[in-house]
């Protein structure tokens, strides 16, 4: 509730809230102090809108590093004075833009703005980076990747800086762009998130079942920062109805559902945090069930489990110009009508996964693959399999796919392993592994198993 507290402290309309870190740091420090004195163990920097794209609104885009480092400094000063055991989470909020194909921003441009902010926060000395209030899984993927890269570049590990991914869900239990909690969790866990959670939009009672859904697919720590109830518009003012006394007990079901880190978002005053802290510390949470690892792929909206314990899955392989002269020519002409029709026909026929191959002779696969991912991710809920041997085409597909894709495929050859494995790890993809080496399939079962194990 930094924004609400800043408004109460005199934030004027049109003034950048994050500029307080530089021009009025004593105001920010006082806000931090109030939360620390009321039970906060982690405080969040005043940097929710301190990425370059957001600071452009105030013509401050050239001061990203200065503002973020100043924010960490004032938070650390408050901790040193009021609660030395507390830790600092560097806040990175949404850019306010949508990525292609929902909007006009490229993945790389969103990545770059988060990378710049993450580098500054890490340089300042945060204990966590908290990517929060995100409503689009592609924006989260870009922010997470930027944070991981910034951490690596600084020579840090997750023991030094943990990365928290917090989505914001609507009353229907999905993000505004349609992603449910289990799908969102699967995607960011595969990419390397350290903590996964929810903040904003909803109150504790509405968020509890969503935390349960997250806990059903991961063993990672879970964070939760609800609003002080569902927002209400009273006399043209947004009001959050839960009192401090009411909110504390309502957080206990969230803890029992699996949340490790709990706090508050909009409308939560220092008194709310004190109520939450007292309730949680006096409560013995239920033991969280251990989740057995599973192979899961997703689209933006749908989760699909693979394995010997599931039904046989059908992969539709019509989206492939090999041996299809008409499709190949249409792709040369820039037409994706047949691609989209093939996708819909295969889904209607029962395909569980759609294989996407853009290998047209004499053409660069990369722009074709990018266009195919944009078109298909907007058209069908069915998860996609990326079918290419071209590393550039594979990367553009994995980067722009709003889910956890399946890569088709990797084999036992060194070149295949060194090209495909790093991309799968970076973008959190699942792998279809073929027990083939030097173009040959071993005749004996034990040789195939040995090759698979080596992969």
Identify what each model region corresponds to:
Residues 1-455:
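Domain-level signal for soluble alpha/beta catalytic cores
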């Amino acid at each position: 509730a930094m924004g609400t507290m800043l408004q109460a402290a005199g934030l004027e309309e049109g003034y950048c809230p994050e500029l307080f870190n530089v021009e009025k740091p004593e105001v920010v420090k006082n806000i931090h102090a109030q939360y620390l004195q009321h039970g906060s163990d982690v405080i969040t920097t005043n940097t929710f809108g301190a990425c370059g794209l957001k600071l452009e609104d105030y013509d401050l885009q050239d001061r990203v590093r200065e503002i973020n480092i100043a924010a960490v400094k004032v938070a650390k000063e408050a901790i040193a004075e009021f609660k030395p055991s507390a830790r600092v989470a560097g806040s990175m909020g949404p850019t306010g833009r949508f990525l292609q194909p929902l909007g006009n921003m490229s993945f790389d441009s969103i990545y770059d703005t988060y990378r710049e902010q993450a580098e500054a926060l890490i340089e300042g000395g945060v204990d966590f980076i908290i990517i929060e209030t995100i409503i689009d899984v592609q924006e989260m993927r870009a922010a997470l990747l930027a944070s991981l890269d910034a951490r690596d570049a600084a020579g840090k590990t997750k023991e030094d800086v943990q990365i928290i991914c917090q989505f914001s869900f609507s009353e229907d239990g999905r993000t505004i762009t349609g992603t449910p909690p289990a799908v969102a969790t699967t995607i960011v866990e595969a990419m390397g998130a350290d903590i996964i959670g929810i903040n904003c939009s909803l109150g504790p009672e509405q968020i509890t079942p969503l935390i349960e859904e997250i806990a059903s697919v991961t063993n990672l720590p879970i964070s939760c920062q609800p609003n002080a109830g569902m927002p209400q518009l009273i006399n043209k003012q947004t009001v959050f109805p839960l009192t401090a006394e009411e909110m504390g007990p309502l957080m206990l079901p969230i803890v029992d559902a699996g949340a490790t880190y709990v706090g508050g978002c909009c409308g939560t005053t220092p008194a709310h945090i004190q109520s939450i802290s007292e309730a949680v510390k006096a409560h013995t949470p239920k033991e969280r069930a251990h989740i057995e690892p599973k192979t899961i792929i997703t689209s933006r909206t749908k989760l699909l489990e693979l394995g010997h314990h599931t039904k046989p899955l059908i992969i539709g392989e019509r989206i492939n110009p090999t041996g299809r002269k008409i499709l190949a020519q249409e792709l040369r002409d820039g037409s994706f009508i047949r691609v989209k029709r093939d996708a819909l026909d295969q889904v209607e026929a029962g395909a569980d996964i759609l294989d996407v191959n853009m290998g047209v002779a004499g053409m660069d696969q990369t722009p074709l693959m990018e266009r195919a991912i944009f078109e298909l991710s907007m058209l069908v809920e069915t998860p996609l399999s990326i079918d290419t041997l071209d590393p550039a085409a594979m990367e553009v597909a994995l980067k722009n796919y709003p889910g956890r894709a399946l890569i088709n495929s990797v084999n036992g050859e060194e070149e295949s392993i060194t090209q495909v494995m790093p991309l799968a790890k970076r973008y959190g993809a699942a792998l279809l592994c073929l027990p083939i080496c030097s173009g040959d399939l071993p005749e004996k079962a034990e040789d195939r198993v040995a090759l698979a194990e080596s992969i």
